Amino acid sequence: NIAKDESKFEITYNAVKDSGFQFYSYDRGECEKYGLKFNTIMYDRTLTLQTAHEQYDTLFLGYLKDRKEDILSLYDMFTSAGLTPRFVIVSNGERKEKFPFEYRDDYVGYYDYLKMVGTSRAILDIAQQKQDGYSMRVMEAIFFNKKLVTTNTAVKQSVFYDENNIFI
């Protein structure tokens, strides 16, 4: 997401733009703003989930970034509704705070994350501010036949949108 560090992107872009490189983004807004080429996010269809007991209603794994208030609000909403969410926040060097969910100091590998997905009925996708493109969470919900709860309203315009499987 360029919006989180626009100056770093501009430095990189200006340094290599005359070297024949092409820049792509899965976010249409970024493509329009910066003159990039659009391409959807890709996913490896050969990945599979291990069969597991679905013990959580929703799974969120990610950094806090600019989403702290949304994350806390959604966690409270899910637990108040009697759901069993699993939220795993990975440290990004920010000050540790007391959260009502899992907090990890170390990176969670993708295969470990997929094990978490296998134990959840739905995947929670909390878009970053100014993000229009679909995240990997959207693709994972589709490929692993999981429900999707997302804050990304652009999903409603997609060809795969199904109100029975996707909640915005």
Annotate each PLM feature.
Residues 99-105, 113-168:
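Catalytic binding pocket for nucleotide-activated donors in carbohydrate/polymer assembly enzymes
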Residues 69, 73-111, 153:
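Catalytic donor nucleotide-activated moiety binding site of glycosyltransferases and closely related
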Residues 1-79:
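Catalytic core of nucleotide-activated saccharide and alditol-phosphate transferases
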Residues 36-39, 84-86, 148:
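Hydrophobic anchor at the start of a short beta-strand
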Residues 8-12, 44-48, 108-111, 136, ...:
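A generic local structural motif
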Residues 31-33, 72, 95-97, 132-139:
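Short, mixed-charge, low-aromatic patches
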Residues 24-32, 89-95, 151-156:
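Short, polar loop motifs at secondary-structure junctions
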